[in-house]
């Protein structure tokens, strides 16, 4: 049985190794070096060639935004709005949980306090 | 073994050459499989229910609001019991009576001893079973230390005593009962109190309130009873007989006896004579009443009985309460009836048409037909001696069936 297990495991490893090979452009770049430098995975997604305007006016006029620049700005705004919305919901959920817990605790205390005064063997101590 | 068949098959030839045949046979398992965890490991039904109905012990903890009882030590009790046994065994007269089958056990004495010893604890258990403490005092309870003897006077010299939940009819409970208890004894020590004692008796019905499900109906309220003499107490609410409506089953009537520390002014609970039959004015809450006076009052006695409807209550509702008598009956769900079709195939047309009509109208028409064939002075016709021997002619087949069934007394005539 152990030999069967070994052979099967070897076959599985071979299949996995073959199936996991992937050839895409970001993989050709030295990602370890880029991560150590704090650079993005895709060099074209961020950087001076991407974010800065392609030309400037000599008389100081502001350069109009390009189509992709505008699209990226709008995307960033949407992401920021989404982050604010979800953070608000998370904060509300936390506060609601705290409020429900406090309500349950106060209800329990109310029930305990509303009990009658115990007598029984306490009357013997008078 | 979670390997696929392909891998298994590809490796099988290698394994066969090296491994023994016995190793392969252990890979398969015959027979059924146990679903879930084995019985010793899985949770039992009781454990499962307990985990689903989690209760906070602090919230459901019960509180004793009654009197304690001072008892002598167990060794002293045992010594007394042994002395009693020795005296019984050395009694020659008792032996002679026993041998000649003339020994009569005094059951009244047995009852008195039982009431003094374990009777009150049994009464607490019975009251717990009937939900008296839960519905009157919430999470509180008490052991009644003062035995209450309550009995209703019947015709002649008969009495209907109130035990621990026996059934007493409203006819038997029409007048105020006689109440007898030992008011000169201290509930704690069992000795004579030595000074004047004051008691309060409240009789209420936790099941009788029509508008407020959590309130009770106050049937009797006597305060400042001196030394157990009920007739000398201050009656704050006159006795109202029980009035269980028809159809609701049994109701509980609970008598609670409180011991007062001193005379109390309970005038705010006085029920005016004009409001004797006003049920709203008789709204009462034992829990609120006791909470308000729990420094002065301590429950000491308890008795209750059950009662249900009888015919005398119709007059009571009409004359005393001055309301229409309520009748409760089960509201069965209506049987399912599909929409009416223009061509109902395979349906007898007369039954099908009546199925979609108003039942009261159908009943009325049946009654009219029956009365039309009944002589106003001679009564209905005598039934035929041999119904099927008389031919039914010149009528459609469905009408012939109706007439035949009517003569035989079967079929739809039994629905009316």
From Swiss-Prot, chain A:
Subcellular location(s) per record: Mitochondrion
UniProt keyword terms in alphabetical order: Mitochondrion, Ribonucleoprotein, Ribosomal protein, Transit peptide
One annotated Gene Ontology cellular component of this protein: mitochondrial large ribosomal subunit
Predominant subcellular localization, coarse grouping: mitochondrion
Coiled coil ranges: none
Alphabetized InterPro entries for the sequence: Ribosomal_mL52
Transit peptide location: 1-28
Pfam families: MRPL52
Listed GO biological process terms: mitochondrial translation; translation
Annotated disulfide bonds: none
Membership in a protein family: Belongs to the mitochondrion-specific ribosomal protein mL52 family.
Protein name: Large ribosomal subunit protein mL52
Lineage: Eukaryota, Metazoa, Ecdysozoa, Arthropoda, Hexapoda
